[in-house]
């Protein structure tokens, strides 16, 4: 009997809360609530917004470096070698390669945000 009373109480309270959640927002509807929110952009404007090519290049560079770090950096530890010197040499070589490519991007002004 106690289980039935508990279940009935829980179902009643849950149903009451769901009904309140559906009815309460409809009582004070105003124009800003009914308009779609598009991250600050006008939803009725042009869908072709200007796109910064510099942003695209910086994003692609970030993705390339991120993939290099995620895929190449664990390689020395995954090579199943017992020689610590070989593993550390491989890791150091990969870090030097990443640092050199970052320096190259920097000197070519690939990381400059402003034009």
Curated annotation (Swiss-Prot):
GO BP term, pick one: mitochondrial electron transport, NADH to ubiquinone
Major localization listed first in the record, in broad terms: mitochondrion
Keyword Amino-acid biosynthesis: no
GO cellular component term, pick one: mitochondrial inner membrane
Membrane topology: Multi-pass membrane protein
Entry annotated with the keyword DNA damage: no
Subcellular location: Mitochondrion inner membrane
Assembly mode: Core subunit of respiratory chain NADH dehydrogenase (Complex I) which is composed of 45 different subunits. Interacts with TMEM186. Interacts with TMEM242.
Name of the featured protein: NADH-ubiquinone oxidoreductase chain 3
């Amino acid at each position: 009997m106690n289980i039935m009373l508990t279940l009935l109480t829980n179902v009643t309270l849950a149903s009451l809360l769901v009904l309140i959640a559906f009815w309460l927002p409809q009582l004070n509807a105003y124009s800003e609530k009914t308009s779609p929110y598009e991250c600050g952009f006008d939803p009725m404007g042009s869908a072709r917004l200007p796109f910064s090519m510099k942003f695209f290049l910086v994003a692609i560079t970030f993705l390339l470096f991120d993939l290099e770090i995620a895929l190449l950096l664990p390689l020395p530890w995954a090579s199943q070698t017992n020689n610590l010197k070989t593993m550390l040499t491989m890791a150091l070589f990969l870090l030097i390669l990443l640092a050199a490519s970052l320096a190259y991007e920097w000197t070519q002004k690939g990381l400059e945000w402003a034009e």
